[in-house]
């Protein structure tokens, strides 16, 4: 028998990457899981090389990033790949979640819930990472977002000062954020293994949403090569962005060193957090906004329990398809609103879009599933 099937270590890899039975009809939407693995590996690698030259001290952090870009061999490339790699990470994660929502993959509850935890970890990692260059938006973003914890009743202020390590965002804050930013990707890698462990208990879902045991093919060579094609497409796109317009998705304010005495005119996070930021801002109450922000992500954990349809995916459900694409459009609108100033008409658009975000997920989708069941029973 082949060594890969008998060796204690190799057989784990073999069962996950070589002899894994996979549905023969899974589309390119099933590529994003492996792409996220590639993103994580790329981010850890580029991040490691950046950490070799970065200093987590408020006096030198900004200069050390400048030094990386100017003086370190290919430092500019490593930094641009890392910064834009984060954007690609989130593009892939949102596509991966959208695929899960569309095809009913969330019915694998353990896999789905571990996935939501992974999303929270990635968001947390990206947030602390954005603070590290110690530019204006780094500093003020850290100040604004950590300040939200002061909305927690009774312990809020103590909590904020505990996280800051003082009475404001200062050196202690930057140092601990660097420590967290270095640590979390390895935690993410560990949780990813758990995510895969649960997935391999059930096997992959497929676009038809039906049992595929009768028609399985081996992961290698079919999907290993399919994943490789995905890798090539993504890496070409990432390197193109990093080489041709590395600052396209960044904020110009972050080219100015952090200054606690000057507040930027518009404080906003990176594009991938704007939808949640818009939901946060749409509620004119601090605690309410914080709860809505949390709910915007945690609502995903409720999705499996709100599945009413007799069918798994949306492939043959035109009514819910309309709701799904409305939801996608709505998230895009929220992303746009999150980057806009708090003034008319953006305030009301943001409030309507935020309301619609929760309405679509919690009320309309389960309702549509029920209606479709009724329609099927009449047919």
Swiss-Prot record:
Q: Which sites bind heme b b566?
A: 96, 195
Q: Which residues bind heme b b562?
A: 82, 181
Please report the name of this protein according to its UniProt entry: Cytochrome b
Q: Which UniProt keywords apply?
A: Electron transport, Heme, Iron, Membrane, Metal-binding, Mitochondrion, Mitochondrion inner membrane, Respiratory chain, Transmembrane, Transmembrane helix, Transport, Ubiquinone
Q: Which residues form a coiled coil?
A: none
The family note in this entry says:
Belongs to the cytochrome b family.
Additional remark text: Heme 1 (or BL or b562) is low-potential and absorbs at about 562 nm, and heme 2 (or BH or b566) is high-potential and absorbs at about 566 nm.
* Known partners and oligomeric status: The cytochrome bc1 complex contains 3 respiratory subunits (MT-CYB, CYC1 and UQCRFS1), 2 core proteins (UQCRC1 and UQCRC2) and probably 6 low-molecular weight proteins.
Q: Name the Gene3D superfamilies for this protein.
A: Cytochrome Bc1 Complex, Chain C (1.20.810.10)
Gene that specifies this protein = mt-cyb
A Gene Ontology biological process noted in the UniProt record is:
mitochondrial electron transport, ubiquinol to cytochrome c
Bilayer topology reads:
Multi-pass membrane protein
């Amino acid at each position: 028998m082949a060594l890969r099937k008998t060796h204690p270590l190799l057989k784990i890899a073999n069962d996950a990457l070589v002899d894994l039975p996979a549905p023969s009809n899974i589309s390119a939407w099933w590529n994003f899981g492996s792409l996220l693995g590639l993103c994580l590996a790329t981010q850890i690698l580029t991040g490691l090389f950046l950490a070799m030259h970065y200093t987590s001290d408020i006096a030198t952090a900004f200069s050390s990033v400048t030094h990386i870009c100017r003086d370190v061999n290919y430092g500019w490339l490593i930094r641009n790949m890392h910064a834009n790699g984060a954007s690609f990470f989130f593009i892939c994660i949102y596509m991966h979640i959208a695929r899960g929502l569309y095809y009913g993959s969330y019915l694998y509850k353990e896999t789905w819930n571990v996935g939501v935890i992974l999303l929270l970890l990635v968001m947390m990692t990206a947030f602390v990472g954005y603070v590290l260059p110690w530019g204006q938006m780094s500093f003020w973003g850290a100040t604004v977002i950590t300040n939200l914890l002061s909305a927690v009743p009774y312990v809020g202020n103590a909590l904020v000062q505990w996280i800051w390590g003082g009475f404001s965002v200062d050196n202690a804050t930057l140092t601990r954020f660097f420590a967290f930013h270095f640590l979390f990707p390895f935690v993410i890698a560990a949780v990813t293994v758990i995510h895969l462990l649960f997935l391999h208990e059930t096997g992959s879902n497929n676009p038809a949403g039906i049992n595929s045991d009768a028609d399985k093919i081996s992961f290698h060579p079919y999907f290993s090569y399919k994943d490789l094609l995905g890798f090539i497409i993504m890496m070409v796109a990432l390197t193109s962005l990093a080489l041709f317009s590395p600052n396209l998705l960044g904020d110009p304010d972050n080219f100015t060193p952090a200054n606690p005495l000057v507040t930027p005119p518009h404080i906003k996070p990176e594009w991938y957090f704007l939808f949640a930021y818009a939901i946060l801002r749409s509620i004119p109450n601090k605690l309410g906004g914080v709860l809505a922000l949390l709910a915007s992500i945690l609502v995903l954990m409720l999705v499996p329990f709100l599945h009413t349809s007799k069918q798994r995916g949306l492939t043959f459900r035109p009514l819910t398809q309309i709701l799904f694409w409305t939801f996608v459009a709505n998230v895009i609108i929220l992303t746009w609103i999150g980057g806009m100033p708090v003034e008319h008409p953006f305030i009301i658009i943001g409030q309507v879009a935020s309301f619609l975000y929760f309405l679509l997920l919690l009320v309309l989708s389960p309702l549509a599933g029920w209606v479709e069941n009724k329609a099927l029973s009449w047919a």
